[in-house]
A protein has these predicted regions:
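Interfacial segments of alpha-helical transmembrane regions
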Residues: 49-69
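Hydrophobic alpha-helical transmembrane segments of polytopic
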Residues: 32-39, 58, 62-65, 142-145, ...
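Hydrophobic alpha-helical membrane-embedded segments
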Residues: 1-2, 64-82
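Juxtamembrane boundary at the C-terminal end of a transmembrane helix
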Residues: 154-162
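Interfacial loop at the N-terminal end of multi-pass membrane proteins
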Residues: 1-42, 85-104, 121-124, 131
Length: 162
């Protein structure tokens, strides 16, 4: 479902795996927020203009679902698996001069390090492949949330078509 499979299947070593994962991971902020913002606002507008209570509820569920991806990312994934995986990338590529500045929850960035000390320690004792596979598993939950939002919004849109 993500760019992960070719990386874990074909990367010849952990360094290459780390570079490929980071490159793919850093594309996320280019397209995820531009989908979440308008998707949330559009569903809120549709809820406001909905003709039935059921439509309104479905649009609100869709808006809240799609918006929930941001706090999940910033408050759960960034200090956890995102931070751990970026820390592992730093560890593997430090001999090439690669490093990331630290970030805070108020300034999230795919180009900065936001992992907690616990997630960094976890990364130090875990292989790159295992981290990437866990990242994919957590990331797939966000895809599931987006699917739920699409189903709720789609149902609300087509429920009154007759």
């Amino acid at each position: 479902m993500t760019f992960v499979e070719p990386i874990i299947t074909h990367a010849p070593n952990e360094k290459v795996m780390a570079k490929q994962w980071l490159h793919g991971y850093q594309y996320g902020p280019l397209w995820v927020p531009p989908l979440i913002g308008p998707g949330t606002l559009a569903n809120l507008f549709l809820a406001y203009t909905a003709q039935s209570q059921m439509q309104r509820i479905a649009y609100i569920v869709a808006a809240l679902s799609i918006f929930s991806i941001l706090p999940i990312t910033f408050f759960y994934m960034e200090p956890g698996i995102n931070g751990a995986t970026k820390w592992k990338v730093q560890m593997l590529l430090k001999d090439e001069g690669f490093g990331m500045k630290d970030t805070t929850v108020w300034y999230p960035s795919a180009h900065r390090q936001g992992g907690t000390l616990a997630s960094r320690r976890w990364a130090e004792r875990t292989g790159m492949k295992e981290l990437i596979l866990f990242w994919r598993r957590v990331n797939n939950w966000r895809w599931g949330i987006a699917f739920l939002a699409a189903v709720a919004s789609g149902w609300a849109t087509f429920s009154e078509v007759a």
